[in-house]
Amino acid sequence: YYKDLSTGKIYAVNAEDYYLDVDAYIQIEPKSKRKFARLWYGWDDFAQGGINEHGLFFDAAITPKQQKIKGYGNPRNNLGDKILALASTVEEALEILEKEKIALNKSHMLFGDRTGQAVIVEWVGGKRKLRWIDDNKLVMTNFLLSKPEAGNHPDFRYDSIIHRINELESSGQEINLNKIGNTFGLA
């Protein structure tokens, strides 16, 4: 998730590297009386990531397994689709997670909205941890940012993405979707 400070443009990029062979697809849901229009990608009626008509973006990534939080659990439905259907801001997405008593113990989620607000949500050590956007970028891969020692860290992809974004920003070149996308795609 990247916000160009000179133009205010927001870019949400994903480089999917899921290690299982799944029959992934893109699902487009039109607006209805009570639900926002949305596009998500995933498989088996499971939204891995997507965006809605109000500019709320989300993505999820597998992380090292954590203990479950008492009274909370993993979703029993298509959580990503539900959030995109009902939330238009990061705060509203967080409210849905809390209302539904969701605490993922094998992954984390990133939410970003059209205002430039973004957060990574992790559930570590029996608590929900929020890592808010700092400056203008928020990146996650497959390690827990709030507990890197849990596994999958150091992560060359994360380091490469941060390095490439910093290089792009200091180059003086125009920042656009292609260039931001390549900071992820080349990692």
Positions of PLM-derived features:
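C-terminal, well-structured catalytic/ligand-binding subdomain of enzymes
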Residues: 2-85, 107, 113-187
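Surface-exposed patches in mature extracellular/periplasmic domains of secreted proteins
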Residues: 94, 106-109
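Acidic, contiguous internal or C-terminal segments within carbohydrate-active enzymes
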Residues: 81-90, 94-100
